[in-house]
Amino acid sequence: MKSLLDLFKQFTPDEHFDAIKIGMASPEKIRSWSFGEVKKPETINYRTFKPERDGLFCAKIFGPIKDYECLCGKYKRLKHRGVICEKCGVEVTQTKVRRERMGHIDLAAPCAHIWFLKSLPSRLGLVLDMTLRDIERVLYFEAYVVTDPGMTPLKKFSIMSEDDFDAKRKEYGDEYTAKMGAEGIKDLLEGLDLDIEIDKLRNDLTGSEIKIKKNAKRLKLMEGFKKSGIKPEWMVLDVLPVLPPDLRPLVPLDGGRFATSDLNDLYRRVINRNSRLRRLLELKAPEIIARNEKRMLQEAVDSLLDNGRRGKAMTGANKRALKSLADMIKGKSGRFRQNLLGKRVDYSGRSVITVGPTLKLHQCGLPKLMALELFKPFIFAQLEVRGIATTIKAAKKEVETGTPVVWDILEEVIKEHPVMLNRAPTLHRLGIQAFEPILIEGKAIQLHPLVCSAFNADFDGDQMAVHVPLSVEAQMEARTLMLASNNILFPANGEPSIVPSQDVVLGLYYTTRDRTNGKGEGLVFSDTGEVRRAFDAGELDLNARISVRLTEWSKDKETNEFVPSTKLWETTGGRALLSEILPKGLPFSNINKALKKKEISKLINVSFRKCGLKETVVFADKLLQSGFRLATKAGISICIEDMLVPKEKTSIIAHAQKEVKEIEQQYTSGLVTAGERYNKVVDIWGKSGDEVSKAMMAQLSKEKVIDRHGNLVEQDSFNSIYMMADSGARGSAAQIRQVAGMRGLMAKPDGSIIETPITANFREGLNVLEYFISTHGARKGLADTALKTANSGYLTRRLCDVVQDLVVTEDDCGTLDGSVMRAIVEGGEVIESLRDRVLGRTIVEDVLHPENRSVLIKAGVMLDEDLIEELEAAGVDEVKVRTALTCETRFGLCAKCYGRDLGRGGLINIGEAVGIIAAQSIGEPGTQLTMRTFHIGGAASRAAIASSVEAKSNGVIGFNAPMRYVTNGKGDLVVIARSGEIIIHDEHGRERERHKVPYGATLTVKIDQTIKAGAILANWDPLTRPIITEFAGKVQFENVEEGVTVAKQVDDVTGLSTLVVIDPKRRGATKVIRPQVKLIDATGNEVKIPGTDHSVTIGFQIGALVQVRDGQDVGPGEVLARIPIEGQKTRDITGGLPRVAELFEARTPKDKGTLAEMTGTVSFGKETKGKVRLQITDPEGKVWEDLVPKEKNILVHEGQVVNKGESIVDGPADPQDILRLLGVAELARYIVDEVQDVYRLQGVKINDKHIEVIVRQMLRRVVVENVGDTSYIAGEQVERSALLDVNDALRADGKIPATFSNLLLGITKASLSTDSFISAASFQETTRVLTEAAIMGKRDELRGLKENVIVGRLIPAGTGMAYHEARKAKDLMDDSERRAIAESEAAELEASQAETSDENAAAE
């Protein structure tokens, strides 16, 4: 019996493998796969519908059409299995072998494989060291190649045309061999001796850069061939494999027609041309005819492998390009992305969602019909267990009739069985969550309102999919990891995701507001019960100010018990009643205020940190219920009267119109240019709009009421519209402004501002022109949104791909490295506090108390909220913490360097896929970012101009290291440093704020001066940039010639004339001269720079207005010239999504700035045409120089000392330069800060560590510099972890390790250059990746998540990590151990079977 069962058992090969290798197939290998040669192009007989013998669907080669039945019908049934029918030659077996048996075609002439020819760089070209053009000419029979020069002076590998060939044939006769087509190429490949070639190339890695690069490429390729045991001649095919027929099916349609796979067409062409060629060769046809046929065969093989790669694509009957083998695997609808990474899932359904306000957070409502369908296997099992149905068929019938017992069983199997809900697009981890189903009538799924923000769902027709976890393990994972009540924080930033919104917020806000002179004001209550009774009796208003005695519970630190404390609170009725739902341990002060949306979010956060997960979930549910109930009770509604138009509106608008008229008049009389007029008009209207909205908000937000003493007082308004905006429930000041103020300025689709504003608002109504203006720009917004979604999705995909294999693999890597974190301060304002930056990170070095230097926190501790409060109390302003970038774990990250798992609130677990989480956190808000680049101009830039800085706090003044200044004649201090900063310290010497001060600013404070908050620290002219002298002397002009280098400008109004430096190119000057100033001292000599013999020369830039006269005496700190900032081209600022993509792709920005390559003194060399020669000389006398285009803005002047990495030419920095000159830490800081700037502008919070994780992956490859004793080639790019492993092994043997330098790759490049070819091929450029991998004979170690999904295993992350470790441990055991385990398992099984049979016997 047992053996018979084994007979029927499906045979599955052992799935235990650790790696996948790809290579090239030799002709012998292809023949060994094949079950026979396909000789005829026929498919099936049109009369019998049976496959033709030796054709593309031949049953003899590929297997039977019907299970266990030969083609002619002589052998049927299972008893003949394995017999080969003597009449039709078909083996009697299962028909599914037609999916796996391959055939082959013997080619009459060899054909080159197009992938190795045309996929750049051409592998054939590299091996043979010929150009692609030449190889193509040979392959497609346009030229000969010399394969054996014999005794002639011809060179091997040389190309000759037909005429040359004839001439040489006459000259040398048969002394030499030259061939055409793939045969020639094949001969050349066979003639290569890899060992000799490799030696030659290894010795030839010298000479010019280009040559070295080329030789290194060839060397790598040859070594790849040698190592993988692949012969180069296999790149030319002698035998073509034929795909199994069931993978290229022929399907009969109704009406006697057939639908066929394109591959059949392509194969048919190859077979036709091949047979014809074979016949021609047998007939000894003329060379030219055979040659043409060979070329056609080559083309047919090309289009079978990759149609359209060369020449025109082959088309079918309907002019559509045929889908070749290559097209089947690449692209979105190819094998990788469509079938391997994006499978459809069984046991799933989808339906519309509706709101379920009565559900608990961990529940969802599941329609009965859906549940019945989804839980069928469980219902069938129960029916069998209960003995209601004996077979599956009977059970099916039972379920279909829908007897009451079925519904009872459904109730039972659904209990405690979580289901997963998913809303597309699933942009982050919270897009799929598990819930316990509650059966409901109807056909819509009910969703808990609090999880909507995580799913980004609303109830306007959204649909959601339901998936059922089947196995016990899956159910357990769903319950512990995915249950909605376990996911209450966003993994992106650690904020709560279950924050109430809209109605709930409005209800809670209304309840916790206080009102002057409410009913029952001033009453004192003994407890909340009494308040409740007074409220129910109608004696107390919710908003009335009262006093209540309340009990608070606080946790005792020693005993961990809750201890009560009671005190009298001044509060309102609503707040007192709300205090009933507070969990133990949450102080009342948290809700003793008007609860706006932000406050409620904070409240839930505090609750989670203080009271734990369970309490918080219950609390959130209670808040939700109260909010809905109170919003209903409050009865807030809006009417036209609520939209108060400010009284001042008419006068403000009239004033603005008057100003605009004045400017129009100035314009007509030629006093201002058109551009200035436009800017000023836009400015005026912008200001007026703001004034109107200020007046409107002032009027809306306050109302006058009479208090109980009869006085008129002001209180926060109870205007419904104001309450909605103020609470954060819906709407904002900007929207109210459009309803009740004035709509203001509108933008055109190109982003420019229309200068006539809409002065009306929605309450007054718009006229036709105003309506048209407002629709004009709005349409662009809708078009943008569609583009944005696609762009953002693509960014997320690239991010996911680059980090997909980054998993936390160990607890602690033991690194002593880290990066110093301090608060981000810009313009004296703290943009991101130290608290936000270091929360949940591990400390590297002991944190010392700033005053008494005692150890506050030991190294290796993760900072939580309590510790951070200690830090803040002590006033620590910088902490060195571990980051993902400094982690030393190979092929992964360690938990300590990553720190807190933001989505769960504790230290990250081993096995967490932090890479994917980082990619999702950055990609998910992508759709909220803007798409356009901002043109600075018009109103936008006006607001950004600052002309002074003031202190925000009291303290002592200090300056940073690069700050330099001189004292001018008036005794003012003038800044002459490019990157000077004023730092304010408090009395303990801790830095409180720092302000950047521009070149040429006047300092109003001195070092170590004590100042009060609000003091002006420095001021400057915001509209011009000065050129300042550091020394005293008499001005001597050089090259200042009117009409050549300068022009006189006379001001129309004042009549004063100034000299403006002009571009001499326009004046047709031959040599480029630059106007400059030298200083002459009292003795008539040139003033020298102290310590050098350089004269002080100060050059003027084009567009500068000269402020001094020739021969004038100047003192230090005086302004020689001013450059108007208006005159400069305004740079477009790339913002939003494109900026983020640009940073992660590590693109070199256009018009990039230059950084100083070394520390030294600046000088200017001889100018070339249109370029300035900028030189830096270091203390040792080494000189570095760069040519800078004239129009660029050089930030340094002659004789200035610069530090390595300082900006010397204006423009955005190039990340590659930052990495090279300033190192990894500085680069990471740059990318993190820049990305955060974009997101911060949109109000999106993302934790820095996510960006760091991405940067780590961008830096994961290194360039080998000195090869040492390794087998690498200098200049080769390798995986950092792999190289470090190799180096460790070498050190252990006492050999020389390789040295390397860091390499920054953009995310696309980094994804494609990963060691895993499966992951790279499924990302982009599939052909190129696979070609390269096959030639190198690459092994994929299946380390990442993607590779494992593709080969169909559990991913090595989370619970899958344990599975893989156990599997590897089992592989390491020896056979005896394995046998012992198997025997013990079998014994257990037999024992249990014996027990059940005993029980059954007893029962009978």
Swiss-Prot record:
Its EC number is 2.7.7.6. This is DNA-directed RNA polymerase subunit beta'. Mg(2+) binds at residues 458, 460, 462. CDD domains: RNAP_beta'_C, RNAP_beta'_N. Residues 1377-1404 are annotated as: Disordered. Zn(2+) 2 binds at residues 813, 887, 894, 897. It comes from Polaromonas naphthalenivorans (strain CJ2). One of its GO terms (biological process) is DNA-templated transcription. GO terms for molecular function: DNA binding; DNA-directed RNA polymerase activity; magnesium ion binding; zinc ion binding. Binds 1 Mg(2+) ion per subunit. GO terms for cellular component: DNA-directed RNA polymerase complex. Its cofactor is Mg(2+); Zn(2+). Belongs to the RNA polymerase beta' chain family. Keywords: DNA-directed RNA polymerase, Magnesium, Metal-binding, Nucleotidyltransferase, Transcription, Transferase, Zinc. The RNAP catalytic core consists of 2 alpha, 1 beta, 1 beta' and 1 omega subunit. When a sigma factor is associated with the core the holoenzyme is formed, which can initiate transcription. HAMAP family: RNApol_bact_RpoC. It catalyses: RNA(n) + a ribonucleoside 5'-triphosphate = RNA(n+1) + diphosphate. It comes from the Bacteria.
